[in-house]
Amino acid sequence: MGFFEGIMLRTRYIEWASQLEKVLQPASLQGKTECVRCGFCCARRPCIPTPDELKVIAEFLGMELKEAVKKYFVGDVLGGKSIEYVFPAKHSQEDVVGEFLPARRTYDEGYCILYDEEGRGCTIQSVKPRSARDAKCWEDTDTLTPALETWRGIDIEEYGIER
């Protein structure tokens, strides 16, 4: 993916997210300090489970780890830190589950594959990763960095991600 293509995709994604935020009206726009289950967090970018949380999620789903990864997750890399990690794909990325997410797909629109749009909730709520449990749209907090750091030095191919 070229530089300008990346800028265009990012710009289009930001516009989409801005429109979605207006429609969904998350707690931050309502002046509330509790989750209103609008799904905006689950649409912007899925949460990042730690390697241990990923194993718990697979068990909750009644699957072997690699089986769950190949059905629901993708791999990515945090640019400046060279940390590879695994996280839930979006519904629009179902064609690349179990694979390393192509750069041009970073800004795909849509909800997390584990989010139930009709029921407006997480299908793995009881084992939802800490990065999602701690996320509060009404606060400016970084819940992803701690989860990302747990992936440092881990080969995500061991979790079933194909390159």
Where are these regions (language model features)?
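Short loop/turn segments that flank or connect secondary-structure elements
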Residues: 1-163
